[in-house]
Amino acid sequence: MLLQQRKISVCIGALFGSLFLGSTASAQLSPPSDYGQKIGDVVVSATRSGTELKDMTQNTSVITSEDLQNAPNQTVDQVLKNQSSVFLNDQPYYEKDPTGQSINVRGLGNARTLVLIDGVPANDAMYGTVQWNLVPLSSIEDVEFIRGGVSNLYGNYGMGGVINIKTKKINDTGGEVSGSYGTFNTSNIAASKDLKVNDVLNLRISADLFNTDGYVQAANISPATSYPNRLKINGSYQNAPLLPGMGPEAAKSGNYRLQGDLKFSGDTTGFFNLGYHSMSNLTPGGYSGITKSTEESTFAGGVKTLIDADSDVKVNAFYENTSLWQQNATNPISSTTGTVTGPYYIGSNYNDPYYTLGASAQYTNNVKASLLDQVVLSADARQNSASNNSNTLSATGVSIGTAYAQGQQQFYGLMGQLKSKLDVIPLEATLAARVDQYQSQVPTYWSGGANGSNPLYTNAPNVSATKLSPNLGLLYQATKELDFRGAVYQGFHAPGLNNLIRSYGAPGSSYSFSNPALTPENMFGYELGSDYRWNSGFVQVTGYVAQVSNAVVATTMTPGSATWNSVCNAALQCSSTSTIYGNSQSLQSSGLELQAHYDISSKWATDGTYTHTNTVLTWLGAGVSPTLNPTGSQLGGVPQNMGTVGITYYPTSKANITANVRYIGNSWMDTQHTLPVPSYATLGARANYEMTPGTTLFLSVVNLLNRNYISYAASTSQTGYIVGQPQTVTVGARVVF
């Protein structure tokens, strides 16, 4: 290990040192004027109305192409984790279970924030998680991030905010090839080619491949215990996180895309995207030979027509078909000693085929009347459909329990938005409202014994709800540099199809049931903030409050109750620990957000963020333990204090070096506060060097000091303790032609 670290240090020193030897000729790596916040040029397309960044009434950030090129992290989720109010731990998405690759904004929980890729949803249609693998970092132009309620624009998923990942524009000709290699045998290759077919059509063909051997994630450092030692909480023993048989969690993925830009006339343009995406990784724990895999086929397309100089119509549609195959490992462990008593085996598997289909039409008119500047009207529809077939297996591979369900959801939305910019006083107002009709049906729902024997069929009711999502935003331009803003909003989040149809577990012990009768969650929130921008930087401060009611949570069933009798039978042998999802929690999150950037000189620039978050439960319904889920206690997996500081140095116009420090304060994995996560800080660095006008080399290091620490997470068991990403060195190159 010492020799390896010395080799790494030599490589880092050699490349960093070479940066000072470059020519001072003009190049792309030098900092642009008004770096990162060219207020007159930055338009936030995620608003659906082309709002300039300086006119946003909610806390908004734009991660520019320069930010992406300078970030030590090599995946978009790990770049986003350094933004204020983003709760993503120090574990890259490819090291997580496919059903756990989510994002939490403002402490409101996973699957409550919308993520878009060029305006098309990237949230998984069944689990609500984020398919981060669909777009590699090399394809991204910039990332727009609006915090706070956006259900007025998009309906479902709009509680925490919206993240819109924009890919690079297609050119008439040219292309790009990039590649990288690093620690844990991690490699990434990406290539794209643009070509002009004729005056109507421009195409881009692109592909990228990713592979890693991964690393061991289960923790064996304090406060976790080391095998075979156990931790006793609430009278029960919890096994050590790292058990015999566990290993590195390898992963690989591939993306293949065909994109097109169309210009039918001077007034009418269009686009289309076709893609095939695959990803597979070892099951959590890194059990060799037990894999999980996903395959997606995607399509998106749209047309925009200018009616006149001030108005246009857009029509878009998208489709995604996904197949998810999962296997889970079981390690036989003695309940009295906590020791492993035999080899691990495949304890369960399940197959989830599902799809999502949607379309929208939008009319925009920049009326520029005396009191009205813009009108936006929109209508959209979406359907999600899925089935789940879960099988529980014995150590010999024999089926001992089966559950099957099929369901679908429909969303129909109407949206209207008005914008006004007064001349008498420097006040801008945005008033938007959206009405959504939500429907869900689960026509098939049953659970049974071995190979589906003795099935118990449950009559699942159809669910329908109408949700109103208004939003009022105000912006007061006090001076050219200083503004004050505020917004109040209401939103909702429908239960995921996994909550409606996916039942799983071990018959006779712990079994978790889905609930087709779940209804949407509700959110009310408001925020106040201020932005100060000048030619050399900006400072943004925001305070917010958000309240979520009717939240979905796993509830413990009472033996013999009506709910128990509707899903449990003799073949399944439910136990006193069996759970079913219910709308049985309410929570409140409040906090302070700070973002800043400052160009110290033509050679030095610095960035910083800070987040303070208080997220607590405010109400518990039936089946939710007040001992495990006390009200008024900081929610597990939500650190109260987080911050980042970064600095970039440009020794020449062809080179730069970036270093950043990420700090996470003390937190807890559980809301009962029995599983602490100590505070930690990590250092990252990256160097870029332009060899020629079209060729750039880079070297990045995550966790530069190779600190061994536990990253924050949410769990009620110490088996949820995972280590943060170990020192990861990556060297790569990009060639643009």
Predicted stretch roles:
Residues 356-362, 407-415, 513-519, 525, ...:
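Outer membrane beta-barrel strand-and-loop segments of large Gram-negative receptors
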Residues 261-277, 295-453, 459, 464, ...:
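Face-selective signature of the C-terminal outer-membrane beta-barrel domain
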Residues 280, 323-325, 383-392, 437-453, ...:
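Surface-exposed extracellular loop regions of Gram-negative outer-membrane beta-barrel proteins
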